C-alpha cells in the first residue's frame, strides 16, 4: 500500500447513526468529552459519511479499535472476534468494508496484541483458577493470588490494572493472535495497524509478518529501523511530524538541519518511506490547530509538508475542518457536522492538497532530491519516471530566494 490518502477515525466520536440516538448513557454529541464518556459513534455512522470522505479525496480509512472492549477507546480487548456492541455487529462491519471498497476506499483496523482486558477469557481463567489455570503462562504473573487491584501483581501496560500484558513470547499466544489476524483478513480488510509493537516479542512480530499479506503499519514514536521492512511495511511517522513541528511551528532549526534530519529518516526506511504515515495528528496527540496555536498560515504550511514529501498523508478526523483539542482526551472530541462551524479556509486547503497529490504520481510515489537551500528555505524535486515536480518551501517569516532558481517561464502554483 502506497500513494494513499489516509483518514483516521476514532469510531465513538466520528458519526452517530440514527439507530444509536436513543441509547442510554450517551452524552450529548457536541458536549465536552472526558476519559470515560461514550458518545455513540458507530459503524453505520461511518458508512453514512462515506460520500463525505470520497468527496474529500480519501482513499483509505484507519479505524481505532473496534473489537469488544470495556472502555470508550477499546484498547482493552475482551473478545478479538466480536465487534463491540456499541459500534454495531459483524454484519455492520462487513457492510462498511464492502461499501468502502465500492468507493475505492481501503480499510485498516487497529490490532491491539500487546495487552487485553482482565475480562479476556484467558485472564478471567487465571482469576478463577489462579496457579491451576492452563493460561497462566499467557501473562507474566509476579505472585498469587492474582487480583485486579493496585498495585497489580502482573505485568501490565502503562501501569493500568485494566490492561494486563500478554506474554507474546508464548507460542500459544502467538498462534492465537495469528488466528485472529487471519480471521479479520477473511473479512476483506486491507491493512493492520499494530499498537505499541515495541513491547511485542520479535518472534511474534515475525509470525505476524509471515502469516498475512495485509499492509502492516506500526505505532513507532522514534526510529523504526528495527521494524521496517523486516516486520512492517511502514510506521506512523511521528519522527517526521516532530521534524516539521521544529521547522514550521517552533522554528528552532534551519533548512540545513531539516535536510539532514529528513535524510536520516529517509535512510532509515528506504523505499518503505512511501508506506509510512505523514500525520497531522492522532488520538494520542494534541490537534494540529492547537499546536499551530491557531496560526492558519502555519497550519497550511504544515499540511504542505505532509502532502508534498514522500509518505502517505494521514488526516486525523476533524483536523480538515479546523477542530480544536489538547492532548488526550480532548483531542478525541466528536466530529463537527454543522458546516456553519467549519473552518473552510483549512478545509479547502486540505482538499486542494489531496487533489494535487491524487493527480500527480510524482507526489504519490516519486523520489525526492534537494536541489538547493538557504536559511529557512529549500527546494526539492519529486521524480517518478518522466514526471517531475519542483517544490520551493519557505518556513521563515521573510521573503527569500535561492540563487539559480527562478520561476519565470514555468507553470507553478502557490500553495501557501
Model-derived features with residue positions:
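Loop/helix patches that line or flank the sugar-binding groove of alpha-linked glycan CAZymes
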Residues: 1-3, 17-39, 243, 259-400, ...
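N-terminal structural segment of carbohydrate-active enzymes
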Residues: 1-106, 114-116, 121-125, 175
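Aromatic- and acidic-residue-enriched segments that line the glycan-binding/catalytic groove
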Residues: 2, 18, 23-26, 72-84, ...
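Hydrophobic faces of well-ordered beta-strands that scaffold small-molecule active sites
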Residues: 5-7, 61-63, 107-109, 192, ...
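Conserved, mostly hydrophobic/aromatic
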Residues: 9, 53, 63, 80, ...
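The substrate-binding groove and active-site-proximal loops of carbohydrate-active enzymes
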Residues: 31-44, 76-90, 159-174, 189-199, ...
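Active-site-proximal helices and loops of the catalytic beta/alpha 8
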Residues: 97-103, 115, 127, 179-182, ...
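Active-site-adjacent "subsite" loops/lids of carbohydrate-active enzymes
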Residues: 121-189, 197-198
Amino acid at each position: 500500500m502506497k500513494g494513499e490518502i489516509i483518514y483516521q477515525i476514532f469510531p465513538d466520536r466520528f458519526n452517530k447513526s440514527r439507530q444509536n440516538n436513543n441509547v442510554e448513557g450517551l452524552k450529548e454529541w457536541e458536549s465536552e468529552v472526558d476519559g470515560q464518556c461514550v458518545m455513540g459513534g458507530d459503524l453505520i455512522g461511518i458508512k453514512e459519511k462515506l460520500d463525505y470522505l470520497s468527496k474529500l479525496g480519501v482513499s483509505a480509512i484507519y479505524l481505532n479499535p473496534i473489537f469488544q472492549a470495556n472502555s470508550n477507546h477499546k484498547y482493552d480487548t475482551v473478545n478479538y472476534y466480536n465487534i463491540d456492541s456499541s459500534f454495531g455487529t459483524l454484519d455492520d462491519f462487513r457492510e462498511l468494508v464492502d461499501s468502502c471498497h465500492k468507493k475505492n476506499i481501503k480499510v485498516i483496523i487497529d490490532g491491539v496484541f500487546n495487552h487485553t482486558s482482565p475480562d479476556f477469557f484467558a485472564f478471567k481463567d487465571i482469576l478463577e483458577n489462579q496457579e491451576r489455570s492452563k493460561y497462566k503462562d499467557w501473562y507474566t504473573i509476579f505472585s498469587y493470588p492474582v487480583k485486579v487491584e493496585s498495585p497489580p501483581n502482573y505485568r501490565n501496560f502503562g501501569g493500568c490494572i485494566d490492561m494486563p500484558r500478554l506474554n507474546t513470547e508464548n507460542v500459544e499466544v502467538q498462534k492465537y493472535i495469528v488466528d485472529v489476524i487471519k480471521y479479520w483478513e477473511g473479512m476483506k480488510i486491507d491493512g493492520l495497524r499494530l499498537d505499541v509493537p515495541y513491547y511485542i516479542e520479535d518472534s511474534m512480530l515475525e509470525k505476524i509478518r509471515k502469516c498475512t499479506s495485509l499492509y502492516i503499519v506500526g505505532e513507532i514514536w522514534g526510529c523504526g529501523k528495527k521494524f521496517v521492512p523486516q516486520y512492517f511495511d511502514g510506521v506512523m511517522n511521528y519522527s517526521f511530524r516532530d521534524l516539521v513541528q521544529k521547522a514550521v511551528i517552533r522554528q528552532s532549526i534551519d533548512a540545513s538541519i531539516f535536510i539532514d534530519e529528513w535524510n536520516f529518516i529517509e535512510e532509515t526506511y528506504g523505499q518503505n518511506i512511501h508506506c509510512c504515515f505523514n500525520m497531522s495528528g492522532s488520538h494520542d496527540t494534541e490537534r494540529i490547530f492547537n499546536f499551530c496555536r491557531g496560526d492558519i498560515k502555519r497550519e497550511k504550511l504544515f499540511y504542505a509538508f505532509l502532502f508534498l514529501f514522500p509518505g502517505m498523508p494521514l488526516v486525523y478526523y476533524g483536523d480538515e475542518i479546523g477542530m480544536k483539542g489538547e492532548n488526550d482526551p480532548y483531542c478525541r472530541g466528536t466530529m463537527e457536522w454543522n458546516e456553519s462551524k467549519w473552518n473552510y479556509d483549512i478545509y479547502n486547503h486540505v482538499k486542494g492538497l489531496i487533489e494535487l497529490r491524487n493527480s500527480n504520481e510524482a507526489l504519490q510515489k516519486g523520489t525526492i532530491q534537494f536541489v538547493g537551500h538557504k536559511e529557512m528555505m529549500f527546494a526539492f524535486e519529486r521524480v517518478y519516471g518522466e514526471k517531475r515536480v519542483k517544490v520551493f518551501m519557505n518556513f521563515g517569516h521573510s521573503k527569500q530566494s535561492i540563487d539559480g532558481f527562478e520561476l519565470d517561464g514555468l507553470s507553478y502554483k502557490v500553495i501557501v
